[in-house]
Amino acid sequence: MRSPPEPRTTPAPVAVTAIPRTIPAPVSPPKPAPVSTPEPLAIKRVLDIGPIKFGDYAWDTKNVPAGPVVITVDLAAQTLSVFRGGYEIGAAAILYGTDDKPTPLGSFPITMKDADHVSSIYDAPMPYTLRLTDDGVSVHGTEVAWGYATHGCIGVPTAFAKLLFGEAKVGDRVIITRGKSLATGETLIG
């Protein structure tokens, strides 16, 4: 006769204790950054330069503190003015678009800067370009002479464009009007 098989030695069941872990609290979705509302910018100084002729410009940053830059363009007066912290630091005679290719009115942020830009449409140099619109309207250097016009851009004397290019940043505002000029004490939205 055979002897009964030896019982197998199976380990006894072991109780497993769960290790407590901290479950992070649900993360709320990120909130969008607050959108800044442009602050009104008071005009504190206008350059005392008299009438500007085609090709002329003025630039004076002496004793002007740092501050936000706002560029205004008056198509009726054919002038561009540069304000830093409310002080006019530059002004120039401009060229602008024709009836067929008009310069748009409104407030535009500078979206791109390119010191050596060449138009992909007209194969023309556009030195010191400050791009304003997706379809290519820009402020740029050119020969500013009576009888000339642009295809919608704002042309300024090239030497002035270089100074403006050094002062302006992407995001700075360019306000284009037809017949609205600013005087000391007035405000504009930057």
What are these regions, as identified by a protein language model?
Residues 1-18, 47, 54, 59-66, ...:
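Exported/periplasmic cell-wall-interacting domains
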Residues 5-98:
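Cell wall/extracellular polymer interaction/catalysis modules
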